């Protein structure tokens, strides 16, 4: 089933809330990490099956380690393919990272932004696409260490891999913001100005934790981030992509800017992994996504007619 509109990540803690949603809710689809469900059974799987009968499913991988050196895990790929076939899922994305090195590392570690890494990751993406028999999408990740060997910036790296592998781009707006603030290398708005919008087919939005005080808002006119390539600038705060907080206003603003830049409005999902508030608060955030989508879809149509 095709994805559209606003969605919410399915978590076991939210199972009952998903099942209680009315048919006309603003939650149009749900997303799962396949690693959590390939071998899951019992009551948790029964509730998941009930939810999957009602909501189209996006599948977002955690462990393929597209940037890793070890051969791709064919057993995991087979499990992903079987899960997607069972639930008629038509969308799969994975992180631009690696998570194994002589063993599983249980974290998503960043790649050096180099031409060699572009070729390496793109080849592995092509292998995944051949195995699954479909185009996948690549998500930009948050990272906390910038490689000194990088020869390009983050958005150039993402675009180059997507073009080389002929894959989609899964845009994580919160990750763009977190990286922009933490590293001071790339204005989040400039990232969106340069991303290959023709390949963006899915969006994530989430909350982050401010470890050392609130971050100052970043805007397109911020001179400190004006150039697409810049020098490292130490910042007094650290943002951590936790998925455990409400979406910050700065990130909502960035999502709106993304919608303005894109030629279409992609399906957009709210991520929340822990520290769950009352479900009404999560629902309100999904509702806000839907409202922004409707607003900018209307503006896109009006602009086309004006042209």
UniProtKB/Swiss-Prot annotation:
Gene3D superfamilies: Divalent-metal-dependent TIM barrel enzymes (3.20.20.150). InterPro entries: MbnB/TglH/ChrH, Xyl_isomerase-like_sf. It holds the Pfam family MbnB_TglH_ChrH. Belongs to the UPF0276 family. This is UPF0276 protein PM0211. The lineage of its organism: Bacteria, Pseudomonadati, Pseudomonadota, Gammaproteobacteria, Pasteurellales.
